From Swiss-Prot:
Protein name, per record: Short neurotoxin B
Residue spans of biased composition, Polar residues class: 1-16
CDD domains per UniProt: TFP_snake_toxin
Role played: Binds to muscle nicotinic acetylcholine receptor (nAChR) and inhibit acetylcholine from binding to the receptor, thereby impairing neuromuscular transmission.
Length: 62
């Protein structure tokens, strides 16, 4: 699996996930800087107030 891993407004980058990791995630929340977006491999647990989208195809988490 290959997932995007660039933060918020940075240029797009992606990376290959470890063997057996088939999910990508896109996590969003707001703070004093505005909307923060984090991307990567896997499908992490998140606290309430954080929007999480997980998907299972290459580069699906932009």
């Amino acid at each position: 699996r290959r997932c995007f891993n660039h933060p918020s407004s940075q240029p797009q980058t992606n990376k290959s996930c470890p063997p057996g990791e088939n999910s990508c995630y896109n996590k969003q929340w707001r703070d004093h800087r505005g909307t923060i977006i984090e991307r990567g491999c896997g499908c992490p647990q998140v606290k309430s107030g954080i929007k999480l989208r997980c998907c299972q195809s290459d580069d699906c988490n932009n």
